[in-house]
């Protein structure tokens, strides 16, 4: 790969993780004026329109699939896309944006562990090291440094909901690896957005406390900007940038950039005037170290092996 192509890939991945990280405090700010379900409807609605227009522009027809394949793709999308967004934004209404970003930083690791269980393979030493270190960093933040809370399972309810959303997304990510062999990713993502929109819309219909139309008409310009940012940049833009980066540097190298999500979340939260504590920064550093150290050790072994070859 040329240096210019490599630089472009790095910029794409950094911009992508900025969009994703910023979506946490931006979403937290929007929840001051709209219900979590209303926010998710906006996100899915905007993303669906943008992805549809992109697919039409690129002349991407819907694939020809069997009813079983359609059912599987829609079902997995409802669990993953719907579960993530429902858990994330419902949880953010009750917890700190930085906590949410830290919990979501566990997703690549959890996806790897799900793969190990599904394939009946024992996780690698690097994966186990990352699991212990990263969980320690996350639990440090979620318990406010009082690990005695673990004995009584005393966690913030919002943190628990986001954790469940992260599990849904990790399962979705693993299952998507199989679906991608027979369904292109852009149409698959569009199906995911439409499936999520349908499920959340049904939930809104049966939720007496949620009034998306009235809430949308009453929002301020800043919150309208928040919703547009989450829908366009935090969803569609981030996804397309991620695909572009992965194609150029590979999935393994690209996954390292996921470590920047909590960093950008903290920076954006600070810009919004939201609280960023020293404990959260320490937990963030521990999580990033837990994810990076095994990769750096592996790279070092590979370099030594190439020198000795």
Model feature map: region roles:
Residues 17, 40-42, 81, 85-86, ...:
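Helix-helix packing/entry segments at the starts of transmembrane helices
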Residues 51, 111-113, 117, 148-211, ...:
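Transmembrane alpha-helical segments that form core, pore/gating elements
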Residues 18-21, 25, 52, 77-82, ...:
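Hydrophobic/small/kink-forming positions within alpha-helical transmembrane segments
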Residues 19, 23-24, 52-104, 140, ...:
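Specific transmembrane alpha-helical segments of multi-pass solute transporters/efflux pumps
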Residues 1-41, 151-178, 200-202, 309:
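Glycine-/small-residue-enriched transmembrane alpha-helix faces in small-molecule transporters
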Residues 5-9, 33-37, 41, 64-71, ...:
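Juxtamembrane helix-entry segments on the extracytoplasmic side of multipass membrane proteins
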Residues 51, 123-145, 259, 279-298:
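Hydrophobic transmembrane alpha-helices of multi-pass small-molecule transport proteins
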Residues 11, 23, 45-50, 103-117, ...:
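Alpha-helical transmembrane segments of compact multi-pass small-molecule transporters, enriched
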